[in-house]
Structures are given as C-alpha cells and as structure tokens.
Amino acid sequence: MSLHYLPAIIISIAILVLLLVIALKRNHQLAFYITGTGLCIACVSQCSLLSASHFSDELFTFSSMSGVLSVLLLGILIFLWLQLHTWLEKHEANHKEEFYLLLLLASLGALGMIVSEHFASFFLTLELMSLSFVGLIAYSHSQLSSQEAGVKYLILSAVASAFMLMGIAIVYLQTGNLSFQYLADNVNNTNPSSMLFTAGLIFILIGLLFKLSLVPCHLWVADIFEGAPLPTTALLSTVSKLASFVVLWKLFHLGNWQENQIVLTLIGVVAVASMLIGNLLALLQNSILRILAFSSISHFGYLLILLFLFNHNADLLDNPTFPLEALLFYLSAYLITLTGAFSILMKLEGGKSLEALTGLFWSKPLHAASLSIVMLSLAGIPLTLGFMGKFYLVTASVSYQVTWPLPFLVIASVIGLFFYLRVIMVMLSATQSPHSSPSTSGEVASLWFIILLIMGLGTFPALFADTIKSVVG
C-alpha cells in the first residue's frame, strides 16, 4: 500500500480509538486530544508527502494539487478543532464525545472526495461525509431548530444523491466506465452531443450544485446554517464545500467540454444567477449566519467563472496554469477568511442575529476589529486576502478573453459591499449592555492570528502566490 494513504489511515485509527473511549469510559478532554492528535499527525504526514511523486490507482489519484487541497482541508479542521472544547463545554451538556467522532468521519469522507478518481470512490466518500453531517447538524437534539435543520439537510442530501446516481448510471451506460479520466477521454474523443450522455452529465452537475448550494439548488441553505450548531455550520461551509467543489473542478479540468454547449451554458447561467441572487438575498437578512450562507452562494458563483475558463478555448488545456492558480488562490482565500469568521463567532456569547453584535467595538474591540477585517476581506477590499482572490479571478478572465461575466461580478460585489459594511456599522453602534466576559490569552492569540493572516497575505501575497504556482506548475 502506498504511503499516500497514510493521512486517511491515521484518521481512521483516531476514529477507532475514539470509539473505544466512548464505549469504555466517556471523557470529553480525552476525546478532544485524540481528535486533535489524529488531525495534526495526518496534516504533518500530508505535508511530508507533498514532494512525493504522483501516484494513482483505479479509485484514487494523489497529485501535488490534491496534496495541497488536503493540507488546506486539514488546516481548517485543526483551527476549528482548537475552538471546539470551549464551545462544547458552554453549549452542550451531554454526549460531547460523539461530536468529535462525527467530525473525524466527515473529515475522512472529505479527504477521500479530494483524491477520488472514480465515481464509485467519490460516491462512497460523499455519503460518508454527508451522513456524518446529518448527525452534526442535528446534534443539539434538544433544540427544535437543530432537528429541523438536520431533517432538511437529510432531504437535500437524498435529492442530490438521487440525481448523481441517475447521472452516473447514464454515463456508465454510454461509456462503460466510471473513471473520471475515462469520462474526460470520452468527451474528447467521441461525439458528446448525444442527448442521453448530456442528460447524465447534467444530473451529476445538479447533484453537485445541491452540495454547493448554488442557484437554483439553494433551497433551505440559510435555514440549515442558522439551525445547526455553530461549529457544524463552520464545517459545513468550509469542509463540505471544499470537497464538493474539488470534484466539480476535476470533471471540468480533465476534459475539453467546448463542444458540449448545453453544459457550458448551464454553468454560465448558474454562475451569474448565484453571484447576483446570493448577494441580493443576503441584503434581506438579519442573522449573521444567514448572511454568510447567502454570501457563500455568490462566492462559489465567482469560482464557477474559473471553471468556465478551462473550456472556453481548446488551447487552454495546453496551458491551464494561470486559471488553476487563480482558482486555488481564490478558493484558499475564501475558505481561510470564512474559517476566521466562524472562529470569531464561536468566541462570542451572543445570539445569531445582527443585534447580538451591537456595540461590539466598545465592549470587545479586538473581536470587533478581527470580524471587521474578515468582512472587508469577504467584500474584496484592497489589502486583504479576499481582494487578491478577486484580483486573480479578474486577471484570469481578462487574460483568456472571457469578459462577459465581469460586469455581473462587479454588480454582485457592489451589492455584497452593502451587507458586509452593515455588519461593521452594527458593531460600531452604541450600546449600554456589555458583551460577555474578558478574553483569555488563547482567544487574543487566535484573533491576532486571523488579523495578521488575512492582512499579511493580502498585503504581501507573493509568498502565497509563489507557493501555489510551484504546486500547479
């Protein structure tokens, strides 16, 4: 067995150890450390494998790109894990250990999706991740909103899986193979205008659109974000979407879909609709979680533009480096910023409404400053990491002469600026009621880390960009 499987094996061992701990003697502190140890060792092993040669078998492919995405995933998980112990002690009375177990199972599924190269391995790891998230979302079983969110996510997951299974079956009927690469070769070498083949592809895409909550498959996404426990919402918006988007990227990057105008038109329409509708719906919200839910729709709409670049001209497949760089930079920038946002919200004791943030600048200035920087980064304001992500996106579009989405991107960004600034204005409002207790040294350190990371990489992006370029190249 190849060493490339080591991170997944380490997480699997952590899952087994945690199961024994839960069965023999419950201990929240021990479960916390077992989870963290598993994630940290898996991340270190994944980093050590970045320089290893490309490895592929029938079900999985390990490349430098998948390695970096796996490190990004594990890094997000570790950062969120650091906040978990305190949050669970405050908000969950019983069965805290199961949260860590479900987190590790979801992590294992997400890692498998990132390296999947076959529809069989993709679907099994997708279901492992999705079923784990059902438990995580409905974890606060004493709260009706959490139970409702869990049922809604279960229904959406079932619908997405049904679409994907139907699409996979149709594609297999046409090609006789379930490999991603074979699908790409089939698109390149045969006539992809067959309506049955195209129908299969569209079914698969619809399933992935549900997983990414893109328009028009964004039903209940805000309800799920608001009803789930806050750490689950953080995991759902980062880990789940990263894994799902990587699969979508693979399908478009492996083959030239230029001849299949139906699929390309679908992606273009979904991208524009997600950019505009996501931000317009966010304008109407009074909950910070609902705002982040709808803004995530628009951000992944922006990312769809980069998928479109891979197939706008056939020559792109001979030199795909810059679109790939832009995609990896924007995806990393958005997920890092969003992880920072949820990390800050987990430290605050208020509710999920914007009112809970009123006067935060006067009671907890460091929390407010870090959350403001996160909002400015999500809005794409200069000197932040989010701005550099949008700069890469626009530069790639102009370089490859795909400029038609840019007016929609500008309009959507202007709309988004209003609700991001609204959050900052609420925090600047005067209030007479103080927020929670004094900050611990750990909280202060993590808040400064978020500020320095977003501002540092936004002001001096060369190191981050060069790292991405070396990986993609």
Curated annotation (Swiss-Prot):
**Membrane-crossing residue ranges in chain numbering:** 3-23, 30-50, 62-82, 99-119, 120-140, 153-173, 195-215, 230-252, 262-282, 291-311, 326-346, 368-388, 408-428, 444-464
Molecular function GO labels: NADH dehydrogenase (ubiquinone) activity; NADH:ubiquinone reductase (non-electrogenic) activity; quinone binding
Enzyme class comes to: translocase
- Per the UniProt entry, what are the Gene Ontology biological process annotations, in alphabetical order? ATP synthesis coupled electron transport
Identify its membrane topology class. Answer: Multi-pass membrane protein
Q: Which UniProt keywords apply?
A: Cell inner membrane, Cell membrane, Membrane, NAD, Quinone, Translocase, Transmembrane, Transmembrane helix, Transport, Ubiquinone
One Pfam family for this entry, by name? Proton_antipo_M
User: Record's superkingdom?
Assistant: Bacteria
Name the EC number(s): 7.1.1.-
Query: What do the Gene Ontology cellular component annotations say?
Result: plasma membrane
Name the predominant localization: membrane
Reactions mediated catalytically:
a quinone + NADH + 5 H(+)(in) = a quinol + NAD(+) + 4 H(+)(out)
Subcellular location per UniProt equals: Cell inner membrane
Function (record text): NDH-1 shuttles electrons from NADH, via FMN and iron-sulfur (Fe-S) centers, to quinones in the respiratory chain. The immediate electron acceptor for the enzyme in this species is believed to be ubiquinone. Couples the redox reaction to proton translocation (for every two electrons transferred, four hydrogen ions are translocated across the cytoplasmic membrane), and thus conserves the redox energy in a proton gradient.
Stated family: Belongs to the complex I subunit 2 family.
PANTHER family according to UniProt? NADH DEHYDROGENASE
- Subunit and partners: NDH-1 is composed of 13 different subunits. Subunits NuoA, H, J, K, L, M, N constitute the membrane sector of the complex.
Q: What is this protein called?
A: NADH-quinone oxidoreductase subunit N
Give the lineage.
Answer: Bacteria, Pseudomonadati, Pseudomonadota, Gammaproteobacteria, Alteromonadales
